[in-house]
Amino acid sequence: GFPVRVIIPGCIGGRMVKWLKRIIVTPAESDNYYHFKDNRVLPSHVDAELANAEAWWYKPEYIINELNINSVITTPCHDEILPINAFTTQRPYTLKGYAYSGGGKKVTRVEVTLDGGETWLVCTDHPEKPTKYGKYWCWCFWSLEVEVLDLLSAKEIAVRAWDESLNTQPEKLIWNVMGMMNNCWFRVKTNVCKPHKGEIGIVFDHPTLPGNESGGWMAKEKHLETAEAAAPGLKRSTSTPFMNTTDVGKEFTMSEVRKHASQESAWIVVHGHVYDCTKFLKDHPGGADSILINAGTDCTEEFDAIHSDKAKALLDTYRIGELITTGTGYSSDNSVHGGSVLSHLAPIRRAVRAPALSNPREKIHCRLVGKKELSRDVRLFRFSLPSPDQVLGLPIGKHIFVCASIEGKLCMRAYTPTSMVDEIGHFDLLVKVYFKNEHPKFPNGGLMTQYLDSLPVGSYIDVKGPLGHVEYTGRGSFVINGKQRHASRLAMICGGSGITPMYQIIQAVLRDQPEDHTEMHLVYANRTEDDILLRDELDRWAAEYPDRLKVWYVIDQVKRPEEGWKYSVGFVTEAVLREHVPEGGDDTLALACGPPPMIQFAISPNLEKMKYDMANSFVVF
């Protein structure tokens, strides 16, 4: 307490939290009553009478100094009701909670069972970083997606945790005279109820309630109205005529599809058909992430938004069956929560704010809070994140999908933010607007860029990600298609708005000075000098860090020759690249982003002439 506060992590709170007026240092252990008669775990056969008669209180081996391994379910909360209908059964329910162990030991895994311990599901852990001494003093939050119909058939949900010493929790409560250090499986009972007329649901019952509140299944104070009700009937989804589908007779539930959401097995659903895209991961032009971001889901709308008829025909090669869906006889109400319990759980839920892009399969709702016109056709947009204390959570080198409904259809386009990765509460997009009737090959202009340009401040868009096959992890290290790659020199060649992923990497390298020794050689192509995006920043950085960044511009035509253009005019040629980017080698990596003809005819063949290993040292964003 004031004026001195000492925090001793790992020591049990009940023993060590004190407000002190004075401290007395003694040569021997305290003989205070509470030092001996509290915070002890005596053997199960010892009751209060025996403990007093045989002086069990004074045996040092039973004192509590460290917590034991424990875990708790916080979501679903007590008295929460989950309706069973066509809406809720088509998406997973996310269980959440926390776990901890004593002595600074790391929680290594958390498991949930829905069948009384016959089988266990491994949860996704979200641990805090350890201290510099390798200790873990904070709660480890965890989550697990489960099928709603699996919850309906379960009698209870139970959780247990393991720590790095392979300690785990006992199945049943072990009695001791003080009732302390109980760490058996945390169980939440499930019961079928009738929350509304004609509807069934699952109500969740915790063992007890926080503080002095009464309730919970252990107290047996509340009787739930139960109903014998079957799950909604199943019906087969209707086939759609837009694809030339083959006669594949297998049928799959959405629950089965969701199990195939990894690099080892990637299934998707499009228009009621199930496709196994695992073999196509390595060949997808946008990288494996473009498929994995939707693996295990129904991505019909998104697939239609960004794929051509040719791609739709190609998809049919991977068709394995049809989707079985539930009936639609129930309403789509959201879960109903017990309000009193929510107030107790709120601090737990707020304690760790996950990055906005914590789940690549979910869209986040972002509000336009700033819009700046940098030139006739270039805009800088600022979007706020769902929470003001969040970061976007986009790894360096990856990009996001911006999603919007335009003229009644979903439109999705990939963008790389120009804001720093650790910006809190918002992110920035630099967008070149392609207007109608300005390019003969594209008379309608850019659908998404014109839409963004038309948005008033206060409007919302949806964002999804991260996706992409390239990630810069710092100090010359990359992860490319899941494989580690290190480079001390980067050849960065881009055109137009393809500067944004390069800009993100340049920004990361220069922020990590002097530790990051990566050399960057940027060749940036545009139509005119007025089309060069982020030129002020690039020129400033090149002047400030001449040993780290070299910039060379290439334009088709000079608009103002009187200003003395000192860079290249024309195309990105072999001569330009030989002069301004390093030759290929084991420590050199080429990064490219631009229009496909530029990649195919200007960059790839010329880098190959410069001894680049095009399979391992050339990456296209």
From Swiss-Prot:
Source species, domain of life: Eukaryota
Stated consequence of mutating C593S: Reduction of activity
Binding site for FAD: R413, A414, Y415, T416, L430, V431, K432, F435, L447, M448, T449, S497, T500
Pfam families named in the record: Cyt-b5, FAD_binding_6, Mo-co_dimer, NAD_binding_1, Oxidored_molyb
Binding locations of heme: H284, H307
Example GO BP: nitrate assimilation
Record-annotated membrane-spanning stretches: none
Keywords assigned: Disulfide bond, FAD, Flavoprotein, Heme, Iron, Metal-binding, Molybdenum, NAD, Nitrate assimilation, Oxidoreductase
One Gene Ontology term of the molecular function aspect: molybdenum ion binding
Site positions for Necessary for efficient electron Transfer: C593
Cofactor binding mode and count: Binds 1 FAD. Binds 1 heme group. The heme group is called cytochrome b-557.
SUPFAM superfamilies, per the entry: Cytochrome b5-like heme/steroid binding domain, E set domains, Ferredoxin reductase-like, C-terminal NADP-linked domain, Oxidoreductase molybdopterin-binding domain, Riboflavin synthase domain-like
FAD-binding FR-type domain span: 361-473
Cofactors (names): FAD; heme; Mo-molybdopterin
EC number(s) from the headed UniProt entry: 1.7.1.1
Catalytic activity: nitrite + NAD(+) + H2O = nitrate + NADH + H(+)
Residues of the Cytochrome b5 heme-binding domain: 249-324
Protein family: Belongs to the nitrate reductase family.
Role summary: Nitrate reductase is a key enzyme involved in the first step of nitrate assimilation in plants, fungi and bacteria.
Xref: PANTHER family: NADH-CYTOCHROME B5 REDUCTASE (PTHR19370:SF185)
Oligomeric form and interacting partners: Homodimer.
Protein's name according to its UniProt entry: Nitrate reductase [NADH] 1
Gene: NNR1
